[in-house]
Amino acid sequence: GIIPQISVILGPCAGGACYSPAITDFIFMTEKTSQMFITGPGVVKAVTAETVSPEGLGGAGVHSTKSGVSHFVCKDDKETLEAVRNLLSYLPQSNLEKPPVAEKSKAVDKSKEIEEIVPDNFKKGYDVREVIATFADKESFLEIQKDFARNVVIGFARMDGNVVGIVANQPNFIAGSLDVDASDKASRFVRFCDCFNIPILTLEDVPGYMPGTKQEHNGIIRHGAKAKGASFLIGDSGIS
């Protein structure tokens, strides 16, 4: 974590070339034109007899909803580059600097209060994004991996112009329980924020780790430990 690293995939990316973007901090992909896969459809068919299209194997939709490889998906190249520029506005140039402060931050959206959003009945769900809107500068929340592991919401926001990282359980999706994917998603983001001096705000509303054979067999102990370990990194720069 010396400098933030961003990969922009604007076309097919196959074989060993996939590993380089995979070790960077953020990956952008475009709809219909971006693909990432270790072996292409031809090799897959020859080895496994499975027929699959490039898009179905490693398109933007696959990596933004199933694999979690992609962090942002945009409609075209122009929108992608604009999104990269927007992300950079939240990040420091290196681990020796603090995140940039916005000179003109928009006032907090006070159309709803937290009491109106969070129900008294703990069995009822709500959208945690609405809670974030009650304290973050208006339109400042930049959600990351919004379609992957939707039981956890992560992203950058500004509070009085200052950048913060937000990690929040999403009660609207499987009650905000932590599973393998959510643990990976949250822990990776926390580690990034820790590397680049970004304070973390955690919104906790979680019944626990998701039970069941699927989660146990997929390694919930191993992946869940990542989330637990990452929480120890927050230290004095975090609020829960």
List each language-model region with its residue ranges.
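Ligand-binding clefts of soluble mixed alpha/beta catalytic domains
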Residues: 1-240
